[in-house]
């Protein structure tokens, strides 16, 4: 840690990475098409955590409430309030109210614009960052466990086992070069 701290760029990169990673762990609270919390008839509801039918908020259907629907939102606001996340889109929510055809340029509603299907780019970046980093961490952990186990077997048994494992690893490491 002291070596990283001595390098200013490395130190700031570490803090920026950790901040982005921690924020991405709470992606549902930052970018979601469901409210974080809402009050209806003096009852608190947490749509990010639980599913509620539309009938719970004065709607007609037993299906999960579509909170971005103007009718449902109006029903809730008549008898309560809603707290939305900063980005009102999830990674797969399509913005049907775009002023121009998708992909749309940045706007107040979509900070980095939308992709070719009308999905918010910021929301997709947040969720994608989390998936990519967690995948990398899990892959590193699994490969470390396999490597330590293989090295332990080679060291304990030695001889032909060690030779076979080494040849297998040499062939395995050469495979990416073939493609």
Give the residues covered by each predicted segment:
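Gly/Trp-centered helix-boundary motif
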Residues: 1-144, 148
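Cytoplasmic-entry segments and transmembrane alpha-helices of multi-pass inner-membrane transporters
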Residues: 127-130, 134-138, 145-179
């Amino acid at each position: 840690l002291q070596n990283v701290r001595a390098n200013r760029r490395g130190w700031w990169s570490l803090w920026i990475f950790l901040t982005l990673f921690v924020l991405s762990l709470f992606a549902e609270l930052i970018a979601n098409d469901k409210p974080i919390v809402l009050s209806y008839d003096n009852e608190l509801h947490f749509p990010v955590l639980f599913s509620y039918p539309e009938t719970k908020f004065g709607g007609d259907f037993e299906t999960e409430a579509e909170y971005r629907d103007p009718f449902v939102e109006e029903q809730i606001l008549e008898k309560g309030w809603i707290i939305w996340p900063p980005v009102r889109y999830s990674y797969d929510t399509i913005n049907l109210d775009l002023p121009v055809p998708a992909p749309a340029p940045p706007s107040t509603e979509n900070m980095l614009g939308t992709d070719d299907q009308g999905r918010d780019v910021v929301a997709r970046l947040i969720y994608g960052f989390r998936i990519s980093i967690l995948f990398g961490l899990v892959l590193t952990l699994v490969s470390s466990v396999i490597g330590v186990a293989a090295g332990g077997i080679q060291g304990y048994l030695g001889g032909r086992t060690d030779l076979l494992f080494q040849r297998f690893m040499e062939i395995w490491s050469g495979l990416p070069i073939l493609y």
